Amino acid sequence: MKDPRDVLKRPIITERSADLMTEKKYTFEVDVRANKTEVKDAVEEIFGVKVEKVNVQNYKGKSKRVGRYTGMTSRRRKAIVKLTADSKEIEIFEA
């Protein structure tokens, strides 16, 4: 994971993540191979903010059926990034 744009896939904007933004916590979908240090470095480099801590959650792929054929959806990894108190806000979430 060299390029930070390979680590962060997209922001996740839901009702719960919008409530967490008031506490300076932002939610991203990240690469399944990325660790907490890589996520922290990527957020700091892309958005120019200071990260206090990173929490990650792994989601298994779900089994899906189309007729008699079964398959699996992709597994996912979600990161909740908390910024320091003196850090600025991330503008991408302020729409």
Curated annotation (Swiss-Prot):
Keywords: Ribonucleoprotein, Ribosomal protein, RNA-binding, rRNA-binding. Pfam families: Ribosomal_L23. Gene3D superfamilies: 3.30.70.330. PROSITE patterns: RIBOSOMAL_L23. The keyword Ribosomal protein applies. PANTHER family: 60S RIBOSOMAL PROTEIN L23A. This is Large ribosomal subunit protein uL23.
